């Protein structure tokens, strides 16, 4: 790859004209075949990987010819043969072709990403998901509108091919990609016109498709802001398997009235901040209602013209930060801007100034959390705990672990809020719901369950809570801990309750625009 980068720096035309011959390099398929064996050796028996099944590069070349002729006798994504030995051999060659195609396409993409990030002084990029918390504390006080947008992940195969065609001039190299994408769409259970590009499929091919698709989605946003600003900023490069990044745009000035985008900017100095995690992105803007309204209708149209697909209007929805809940990492957080008085004093000239600024003050939204718990059958609509009947078939350890995981995620996330009194009500609902679930399973009473398993209920969460609520050393440290917020680094873990919450909110927004 380093050798390709050096050649690409000297002459960038080679990857647009000579990609297709790389498909017939035996070294490429030797590497891809080794990667496939390494990934499947832990889950498949070793006798299937014996030396009797020799890997033939001639067979690989014939498979490539079948793809060119769109011969659907080979299946790259669905294994239909009941014979495991024949199926294993077929899958080995098919996956090697798929790995080889991915390796070839990664060469120009990595070069394009590497040499397109010049002038990063105007753009500050942080590729860690934990940078979202400094983003919330630093940028939300300077914003008044926030948009929580879900990136469209259902797209037609031909549009994906056209995104590659914009920066790869070698048309024959895209024929195998087109055939593979159409075959994957036809082999899926739901025969739709679109395919789903999500990073949850843990294969090199789908990770590459997702990174390239996100790169294209965000490059149009970057180019729009570049045209609307005097300052020079370049688009970001999303490298493979680096899907979490944080990007900030600042100091956007009003462009010339002769610019075609002058109708977008009705404020001289709008602050625009952007962050993405997984399939969702947050855009924070400080501007007038007219500016936000224009963004609301302009961004879907701009993306529609770029990707040639209809983008639902509810995917871009701005709401006022001071009146609504803000979504982050699947959870919802109510934000209150608290005025903070800062006094400055200059001793020499005896000058005293009082500065008033906004401070990020997150609040735990108790009512939405109770509404979500009632939807998930942990309590009724008034917040009275009930038993989780769907979990009574599980073991006691599984029930305790599931309740413990939900409480730990909620407590760790909202521990960054100053007022955590509402969390104790949530803890009461979950603990009593857990006790009722165990009592319903064993056909006993809550008193018996608490007597037998009382210390074990949320044992890990209680210990973590005591570490936060009872700081060591001195009373001064205890007082300081009450003024400071603590964001835990294990918040981004998978939480089914948070995903369910996000789906409910997306459905509400969709129904709102359908009316």
Curated annotation (Swiss-Prot):
GO biological process, one term: mRNA processing
Cysteine disulfide links: none
Main location per the UniProt record: plastid
InterPro entries per record: Domain_X, Maturase_MatK, Maturase_MatK_N
Cellular localisation: Plastid, Chloroplast
Record flagged with keyword Plastid: yes
Alphabetically ordered keywords of this record: Chloroplast, mRNA processing, Plastid, RNA-binding, tRNA processing
One Pfam entry name: Intron_maturas2
Domain of life, per lineage: Eukaryota
One example GO MF annotation: RNA binding
GO cellular component labels: chloroplast
Family, per entry: Belongs to the intron maturase 2 family. MatK subfamily.
Task performed by this protein: Usually encoded in the trnK tRNA gene intron. Probably assists in splicing its own and other chloroplast group II introns.
Cross-referenced PANTHER family: MATURASE K
Entry protein name: Maturase K
The encoding gene: matK
């Amino acid at each position: 790859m380093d050798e390709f980068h050096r050649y690409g720096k000297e002459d960038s035309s080679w990857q647009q004209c000579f990609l297709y011959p790389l498909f017939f390099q035996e070294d490429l398929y030797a590497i891809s075949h080794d990667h496939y064996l390494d990934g499947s050796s832990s889950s498949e028996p070793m006798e299937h990987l014996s030396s009797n099944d020799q890997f033939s590069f001639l067979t690989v070349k014939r498979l490539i010819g079948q793809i060119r002729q769109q011969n659907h006798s080979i299946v790259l994504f669905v294994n239909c043969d009941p014979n495991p030995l024949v199926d294993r051999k077929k899958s080995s060659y098919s996956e090697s072709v798929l790995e080889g195609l991915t390796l070839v396409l990664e060469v120009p993409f990595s070069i394009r990403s590497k040499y397109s990030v010049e002038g990063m002084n105007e753009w500050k990029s942080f590729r860690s998901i934990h940078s979202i918390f400094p983003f919330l504390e630093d940028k939300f006080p300077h914003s008044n509108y926030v948009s929580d947008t879900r990136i469209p992940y259902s797209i037609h195969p031909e549009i994906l091919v056209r995104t590659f065609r914009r920066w790869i001039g070698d048309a024959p190299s895209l024929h195998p990609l087109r055939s593979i994408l159409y075959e994957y769409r036809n082999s899926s259970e739901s025969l739709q016109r679109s395919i789903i590009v999500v990073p949850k499929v843990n294969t090199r091919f789908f990770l590459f498709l997702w990174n390239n698709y996100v790169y294209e989605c965000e490059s149009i946003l970057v180019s729009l802001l570049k045209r609307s600003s005097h300052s020079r900023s370049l688009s970001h490069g999303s490298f493979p398997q680096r899907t979490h990044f944080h990007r900030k745009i600042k100091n956007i000035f009003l462009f010339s009235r002769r610019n075609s985008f002058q109708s977008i900017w009705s404020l001289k100095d709008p602050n625009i901040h952007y962050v993405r995690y997984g399939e969702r992105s947050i855009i924070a803007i400080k501007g007038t209602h007219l500016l936000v309204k224009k963004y609301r209708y302009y961004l879907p149209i701009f993306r529609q013209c770029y990707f040639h697909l209809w983008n639902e209007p509810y995917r871009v929805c701005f709401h006022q930060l001071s009146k609504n809940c803000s979504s982050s990492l699947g959870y919802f957080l109510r934000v209150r801007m608290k005025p903070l008085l800062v006094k400055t004093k200059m001793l020499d000239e005896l000058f005293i100034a009082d500065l008033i600024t906004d401070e990020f003050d997150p609040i735990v939204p108790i009512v939405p959390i109770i509404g979500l718990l009632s939807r998930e059958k942990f309590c009724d609509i008034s917040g009275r705990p009930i038993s989780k009947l769907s979990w009574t078939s599980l073991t006691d350890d599984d029930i305790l672990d599931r309740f413990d995981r939900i409480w730990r995620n909620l407590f760790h996330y909202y521990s960054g809020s100053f007022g955590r009194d509402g969390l104790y009500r949530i803890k009461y609902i979950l603990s009593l719901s857990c006790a009722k679930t165990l009592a319903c399973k064993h056909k006993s009473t809550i008193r018996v369950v608490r007597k037998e398993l009382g210390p074990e209920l949320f044992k890990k969460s209680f210990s973590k809570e005591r570490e936060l609520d009872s700081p060591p050393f001195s009373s001064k440290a205890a007082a300081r801990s009450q003024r400071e917020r603590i964001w835990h680094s294990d918040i981004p873990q998978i939480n089914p309750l948070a995903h369910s919450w996000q789906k409910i909110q997306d459905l509400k927004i969709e129904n709102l625009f359908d009316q």
